[in-house]
Every structure is written in C-alpha cells, then in structure tokens.
C-alpha cells in the first residue's frame, strides 16, 4: 500500500507540476505497482529533472506499447526482450502485421533491469496444493495479446502437460480485472509476473494463507517450459518461500524469471534521450528508494538482457560516464 501511494504521488506530481518550458513526450508502461510500471514511473520522475516531461500512461499491454512506439505514436515505453524478437520476425501476436519488422527496426533501448518472476499462486482453501490439482480449475493467465499469458500457458503445460482450452479453464483478463477475480474467488489460480516480495502478491498473506507452486526439477527440460525459459530475457530462477508472510510452500521456490528494459525510438531527439539517461543514473539513489527490487539496478546491470541497439543519445551518455557497452548494443545510426 505504501508503494502504491508513492507511485500515485509521483504520477500526480508529473501530471500537476507540468513544466511548460519543457517538451512533453508520451510514455506507456504496465500497471503501476508491478516491476515495469514501478521503474518506468521512477524513470519519468527523474527525467523531469533533466528538463524532459514524460506523460506516463500506465496499465497498458506491453505488446501494444512496443507496437505504438515502433509506429512513432509514443516516445518511451516499457519493453520486453522476447517481444522485440517476435516483432522483428513477424511472429505470434505480430504475425498479421505486415509492417512489424519495420516497426521493430525503429525501436531503441535505454537500459535493462531484472524485473521479477512468474508467481503461480492459489489460496489455502482452494483445494490446490500441487500442480496436478489445477485440472478442471479456473486459472487467470494474463491479459489479451500479452506475452505474460503465453508464458503462463507455457509454464503450466511444461509442468503438467495440461492445455488451457481442454484440461483447465484459462482466464484472459486485463491485469486489474484478473487480480480482482482472484481476490473475489472467481478464479482458483492466479499467475502474476511481479518482483520477488511484491505487495501485489503479499496482500494475500496478510490476513490469510496462500500457496506458491514451485516448478519441479523434473519439468525443467519439458519442451513447453524450455521454450519459455530459453526466450530472450527469461530463465529459471529461485527464491526463498519465506520472503512472503502467510506463504505455505516451504524452502526454495523455482520460478520463471524475466528481465525487461526501458526503451525509446530512433525518432526521438538525441539530446532528449541523453538527458533522460543522464538524469536516471545521476539520481540512482532516488531510484533505489522507490522499491526494494530496484536496489539491484547498478552500472553493472545496466544492459541486463537488452537485445536491441541503444539509442544514440543513451550511448553518448554511457560513453561519457565510462560504462562498458556491449558491442552488439552500439547504435549504427
């Protein structure tokens, strides 16, 4: 709740204290309170110190945000490494968009970060204590046309061999509606990508108990799960179940981890991106105060899982500041 209030305060500050002397740029991110939304809102707050106002539109589906950025409809966005590959190769949700590869070529990166894991959770009274118990149940998988719902299906298929349209009822809803459905017991299981220790998950252990399902070692090489864990920006990771109060699974929990990035487009002015990049890193202490998981954002992790070229403005800052930039991220334009 404290994190939500802090994010809301930042959003209101960005909206109400608009600096008329600075140019304004549109930015899109996922729901406030999740990893991409949290860091993006903090990024926008620091950008204003560099004279760049970013109008943050939160609660968006990132598959669509990256498409909007490629078209030039927005200037900044929360990005997913795997979505960049899919867009560039006109696959999955981008398969029917003829211009998808062209839009992908317009995208540029600013910085990467470790985002979190896919939490597969169910309530104590659900009758579900193991993956096999999901059969015949209602499972919230994520939003329409999103990479998260694809990941959720892959995890469950890999562990159980269950299909979402046959062995259990896969529920596709926007993030907020899915969360409410789980809260109101309208779905039995919720798959929620979030940073480890996030308030969105912890709320279910404050007055009752809940259970996180851990990926068993026997499923790690299953094709459906392997497809997800080997995708750009993803991999199997582990954390202690005790990080959450009221969480019933003891010991280490294995989950599908994911990394993301903050991006822009090649159409945005070099000086603008230089200024927002500089403001972010020069105010890193403020970024670290925003959320626990952001303490892992350092100069050494700046390019975590980034798989598309840096914007030339960001690259200019990184060169000046002495960052070690991977060869494949150096812009050619």
Indicate where each model-derived feature is located.
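A structural signal for short loop-to-beta-strand junctions that line the ligand-binding cleft
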Residues: 98-113, 243-253
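Ligand-binding pocket segment of bilobal, Venus flytrap-like solute-binding proteins
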Residues: 74-78, 167-230, 315
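An extracytoplasmic/periplasmic, membrane-proximal ligand-sensing/linker region
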Residues: 194-214, 224-227, 259, 268-333
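Sec-dependent signal peptide recognition
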Residues: 2-9
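Sec/Tat signal peptide C-region and signal peptidase I cleavage site
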Residues: 16-22
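Pocket-flanking alpha-helical
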Residues: 38-46, 57-101, 176-182, 196-205, ...
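C-terminal lobe and pocket-closing loops
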Residues: 213-275
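Bilobed "Venus flytrap"/periplasmic-binding protein-like clamshell domains
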Residues: 23-55, 116-184, 300, 304-313
């Amino acid at each position: 709740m404290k994190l939500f209030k802090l994010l809301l305060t930042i959003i209101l500050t960005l909206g109400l204290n608009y600096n008329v002397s600075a140019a304004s740029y549109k930015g899109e991110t996922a729901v406030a309170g999740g990893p991409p939304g949290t860091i993006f809102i903090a990024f926008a707050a620091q950008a204003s110190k560099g004279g760049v106002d970013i109008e943050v539109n939160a609660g968006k589906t990132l598959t669509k945000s990256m498409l909007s950025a490629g078209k030039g409809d927005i200037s900044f966005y929360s990005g997913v490494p795997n979505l960049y590959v899919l867009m560039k190769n006109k696959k999955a949700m981008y398969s029917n968009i003829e211009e998808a590869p062209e839009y992908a070529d317009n995208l540029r990166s600013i910085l990467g970060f470790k985002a979190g894991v896919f939490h597969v959770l169910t309530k104590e009274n659900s009758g579900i204590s193991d993956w096999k118990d999901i059969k015949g149940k209602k499972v919230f998988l994520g939003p329409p046309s999103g990479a998260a719902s694809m990941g959720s299906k892959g995890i469950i298929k890999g562990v159980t061999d269950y299909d979402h349209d046959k062995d259990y009822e896969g529920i596709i809803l926007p993030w907020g509606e899915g969360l409410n459905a789980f809260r109101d017991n309208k779905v039995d299981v919720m798959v929620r990508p979030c940073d480890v220790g996030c308030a969105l998950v912890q709320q279910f252990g404050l007055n009752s108990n809940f259970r996180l399902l851990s990926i068993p070692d026997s499923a790690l090489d299953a094709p459906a799960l392997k497809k997800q864990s080997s995708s750009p920006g993803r991999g199997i990771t582990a954390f202690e179940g005790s990080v959450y109060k009221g969480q019933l699974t003891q010991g280490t929990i294995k989950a599908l981890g994911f990394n993301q990035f903050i991006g822009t487009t090649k159409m945005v002015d070099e000086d603008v991106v230089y200024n927002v990049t500089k403001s972010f890193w020069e105010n890193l202490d403020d970024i670290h105060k925003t959320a626990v998981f952001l303490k892992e954002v350092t100069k050494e992790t700046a390019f975590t899982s980034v798989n598309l070229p840096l914007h030339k403005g960001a690259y200019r800052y990184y060169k000046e500041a002495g960052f070690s930039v991977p060869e494949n991220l150096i812009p050619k334009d």
